[in-house]
Structures are given as C-alpha cells and as structure tokens.
Amino acid sequence: MSEALSLFSLFASSFLSATLLPGNSEVVLVAMLLSGISHPWVLVLTATMGNSLGGLTNVILGRFFPLRKTSRWQEKATGWLKRYGAVTLLLSWMPVVGDLLCLLAGWMRISWGPVIFFLCLGKALRYVAVAAATVQGMMWWH
C-alpha cells in the first residue's frame, strides 16, 4: 500500500472514530507505526487531524440539532461543560462520552476558539501517548 493511501486510511479511520461509528484509529495507528510506513510524527498528525475534524463535525451537529436531556451521562456531561467550559473537551478522546461532550459543546454554543484548541489538544495527546508507547515497546523488543 502506498504511503498516501495509508495516510488517507488512517485519516478516515480517525475521522470515523470521532463519531459514533467504529473506526479503531488506535489499532490502525499502531499497525502503521509497526510497519514503518511513515515517520511517527506524520502518523500522529494525520490521526489527530482526522479525529479533530470528526469531533468538530459533532460540535457543528450539536449546534444545528436540539438535544433533549435523556440520559445520566448527558446530564453529567452538561454539568462538566457548565462548570469547566471548553477545557472539558480535553476528554473528547474518550469513547461515547467524548462524542457527547462535543455534541453538547455545540448545543451550548461554547466559543469556537476554546472548543477547537481543547478538542484538538485532547485528541493529539491521546495519539502522542499511543505512539510513544508503541515506539517505546518497539525499542524494548529490539
């Protein structure tokens, strides 16, 4: 598989992982790190961009579609967002809860600047941690 196609696959997987659809972006990232198809920072940046754009898509959807309070998680996430604001989006990488946080950030009309900054930072830190653990593991085994 060419490097460009591999990077597109990682981007698409990361984008889908930021929605409620399964994307398994961490598995794809680790596989690409192990294959050595591209520099680790290129892979981390690609995964971060895809996942961040997916998260921002959820924020946009939250702005357009009204949400009804129906679940305990939604009430808890709304409380976090009211208390801590956009900083809560550092947790946007978490499965299901992160998707809900992004939707609620849009629904609550939190300012774009802080939303973009904290959402991207949270997602980047996750991929940096996965890549660092993988690279360290590779060095340990060799």
UniProtKB/Swiss-Prot annotation:
It is found in: Cell inner membrane. The keyword Phosphoprotein does not apply. It is a multi-pass membrane protein. The chain crosses the membrane at residues 3-23, 27-47, 87-107. One of its GO terms (biological process) is bacterial-type flagellum-dependent swarming motility. GO terms for cellular component: plasma membrane. Residues 24-26, 108-142 are periplasmic. Residues 1-2, 48-86 are cytoplasmic. Keywords: Cell inner membrane, Cell membrane, Membrane, Transmembrane, Transmembrane helix. To H.influenzae HI_0489. This is Inner membrane protein YqaA. The lineage of its organism: Bacteria, Pseudomonadati, Pseudomonadota, Gammaproteobacteria, Enterobacterales.
